[in-house]
Curated annotation (Swiss-Prot):
One Pfam family cited in the UniProt record for this chain: YjhX_toxin
Family: Belongs to the UPF0386 family.
Family matches, as InterPro entries: YjhX_toxin (IPR018654)
Domain of life: Bacteria
Name of the protein in its database record: UPF0386 protein mll0189
Signal peptide location: none
Length: 99
């Protein structure tokens, strides 16, 4: 049985989290969007990530959405869905497109 110390497990989870964020940014850069639903108190209740073709993309939760917003990687205009910003495009690391 392999021995893991807390530090290596923590680093692995951060890497995984960063990889998910990069995947979402890359999908947004290709024309995807993040739609939000608010509750009665006008607070964000849930987020849904859609590809440019309208397919639901799993992996975006409230924490990741807030992180992207805090980094100014996504923004909304006129009450519409959240889309990638110029800052978000700078944060995207290039990724091979498998099409």
């Amino acid at each position: 049985m392999p021995h893991y110390n807390c530090h290596s497990v923590l680093c692995a989870s951060k890497r995984t989290r960063g990889a998910v964020g990069q995947r979402i940014l890359h999908m947004l850069a290709q024309g995807g969007r993040i739609e939000i639903e608010k509750n009665q108190k006008k607070r964000i209740a849930s987020v849904k990530c859609l590809t440019r073709d309208g397919w639901h993309h799993p992996g975006v939760d409230l924490d990741l959405f807030r992180k992207l917003k805090r980094k100014k990687a996504v923004s909304s205009s006129g009450g519409g869905p959240y889309r990638i910003t110029r800052r978000g495009l700078e944060l995207v690391r290039s990724e091979l497109d498998n099409r």
